[in-house]
Swiss-Prot record:
Stretch forming the signal peptide: 1-20
Phylogenetic placement of the source organism: Eukaryota, Metazoa, Ecdysozoa, Arthropoda, Chelicerata
Protein name per Swiss-Prot or TrEMBL: U1-lycotoxin-Ls1hh
Keywords: Disulfide bond, Knottin, Secreted, Signal, Toxin
Subcellular location: Secreted
GO CC, any one term: extracellular region
Organism field: Lycosa singoriensis
């Protein structure tokens, strides 16, 4: 009888210890995931939205539905006759085509 009682107490102790460690691991994973999401959100706030100027920061465009927007540049002639480069964040044609195909695929297959 003493052996069964001792074995039961040992089993309950081991079970509570292992479940506490698993909960600590889950809590740590949740904290890491939360920090990762916060960092991504901060990066998203600093990015340049679609159709906005990105001349000074060509790699700072935000993400679109599937792809990150690309900084597209054109040469503009000012009224004084100077040529300057102006850039904006936009979706390249091959990304537009891929998004169109994915959209049709979602409509067909559900």
């Amino acid at each position: 009888m003493k052996f069964v009682l001792l074995f039961g107490v040992l089993l309950v102790t081991l079970f509570s210890y292992s479940s506490a460690e698993m909960l600590d691991d889950f809590d740590q994973a949740d904290e890491d995931e939360l920090l990762s999401l916060i960092e991504k959100e901060e990066a998203r706030k600093d990015c340049i939205p679609k159709h906005y100027e990105c001349t000074s920061n060509k790699h700072g465009c935000c993400r679109g539905h599937l792809f990150k927007y690309k900084c597209q540049c054109t040469t503009v002639v000012t009224q004084s006759g100077e040529e300057t480069e102006r850039c904006f964040c936009g979706t390249p044609p091959h990304h537009k085509a891929a998004e169109l195909v994915v959209g049709f695929g979602k409509k067909i297959f559900g």
